[in-house]
Amino acid sequence: SMEEAVNEVGSQLGRRGEADLALVFASTAYASDLPRLLPLLRRELSSRHWLGAAGGGVVGTRADGTAAEIEQAPSLSVTLLNLPGAAIDSVALSTTSLPDLDGSAQTWQEWSGLNPQHCRSQILLIDPTSSNINDLISGMDYAFPGAEKIGGIACPHNAPHGSLLFDDRVVTGA
């Protein structure tokens, strides 16, 4: 069950103190329970920021330290990052109404709420039901050309909510 997976993660990582960022990846086997996942994890782990997605396959490290990829089966992976001196700005973006791609970079920067002078890297996770995915990626590249970007598109599922985990809620968009 998801509760057992959360308890196992908590027993492995709970003694580490507060992290700056928690990256959470849950298999779509837990799709209907995604709204409960972050509140359960927050009881076990402490992090200033939470970000994650549902996936068809989840990569992580087992309790014995070996790497594993689990596909199409219940799985949960949590990575806690301590980033001394880093400033983390987390934003949830709606992809339904993007700025014009022919507009200014400043318009995209203001729309995203990110300061280009402090944005050296980005983790961009996108819900598979989002519209304008290519335009979003192009716009973020245009607005933040010097920022390194990593991320991907979450896995679709049949639950009536998004696939992205953001702070304490499940969202769509990016």
What would you call each of these model-derived segments?
Residues 1-174:
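Cofactor- and metal-binding active-site motifs of prokaryotic enzymes
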